[in-house]
A protein has these predicted regions:
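Core beta-strand elements of the Rossmann-like FAD/NAD(P) dinucleotide-binding domain
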Residues: 3-5, 190-198
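Central helical "cap/lid" subdomain
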Residues: 196-245
Length: 271
């Protein structure tokens, strides 16, 4: 393990490994990442992997647009599948106010360069045959939206970062952080110390503990997120046999839910 680096990234989830990769991509090859266990072992391994292009913020929308393009480029760069599926995303509207919100967003999307379609209830059912259209006013669709597999993405990012000169230390827990008078840092781990110029905390569920190391009380706690996994639906299996495309991600904005196929194969379960 190095005892000196330009940057130390704490946390081996998708955020930490993406940070490491992008620093190395920008030319900061003297960067390392410390992960207390294994990559994705925190919350990344069971993340939904959705890539919602919908965002009312121009700046955040640009990041979302970049991400969709980047995932495809990363596969080519590393030769590692990230599980990217461009299956579209449909957001339902149960009232006119919601549709007005979608139309307002369409202006932001046009400025960013994100394609959107507006669907009538009949068009919704054509795209998502299992969806009941009772009480629906319409929907907005992102045809270039979809999802990725978070674990596969993280491993591809790690492969790309290593190829650019970055180093990843698994089973290496950060136990203390100390800032020196010259503003550099001593990062103490259970494997030794690393002196660096910059520390980036991407410690996810452990961010409060990381904050305490530098005297910060960060009011963040992990919470449970419920989801239901069903057996494969007969109509979805029939669609696959007929060679029809995956129905994509369906969101109920007024009910705060989403659904999608977990795996689009003959023995798949639906989420």
């Amino acid at each position: 393990m190095k005892n000196k680096a330009k940057v130390v990234v704490i946390g081996g989830g998708v955020v930490g490994v993406s940070t490491l990769y992008h620093l190395a991509k920008k030319g900061w090859s003297d960067v390392v990442l410390c992960e207390r266990k294994e990559l994705t072992s925190g919350s990344t391994w069971h993340a939904a992997g959705l890539m919602p292009l919908f965002n009312m913020s121009y700046s955040v929308g640009q990041i979302h647009k970049y991400s969709v393009k980047f995932y495809q480029e990363l596969e080519k760069e590393t030769g590692q599948d990230v599980g990217f599926r461009e299956v579209s995303n449909i957001r339902l509207a149960e009232n006119q106010d919601r549709m007005d919100e979608y139309r307002q967003y369409a202006g932001v999307a046009e400025t960013i360069g994100v394609k959107v379609n507006f669907l009538t209830p009949e068009e919704i059912q054509k795209a998502w045959p299992l969806c009941s259209i009772d009480g629906l006013v319409g929907a907005i669709q992102h045809p270039e939206d979809g999802y990725i597999q978070p674990n596969d993405l993280t491993q591809a990012l790690a492969k790309g970062a290593r190829a650019l000169g970055a180093e990843i230390y698994r089973q290496t827990a950060v136990t203390a952080l100390e800032q020196l008078p010259d503003d550099s840092w001593i990062v103490t781990t259970d494997k030794g110390e690393i002196k660096c110029d910059v520390v980036v905390s991407c410690s996810g569920n452990f961010v409060r503990q990381t904050g305490e190391m530098v005297g910060l009380d960060i009011p963040v706690i992990p919470v449970e997120h419920q989801y239901i996994v069903t057996e494969a639906h007969p109509q979805i299996l029939e669609r696959q046999k007929e060679g029809l495309p995956e129905m994509g991600v369906l969101r109920g904005s007024d009910g705060a839910w989403y659904m999608r196929c977990l795996l689009y194969t003959s023995d798949a379960a639906d989420e």
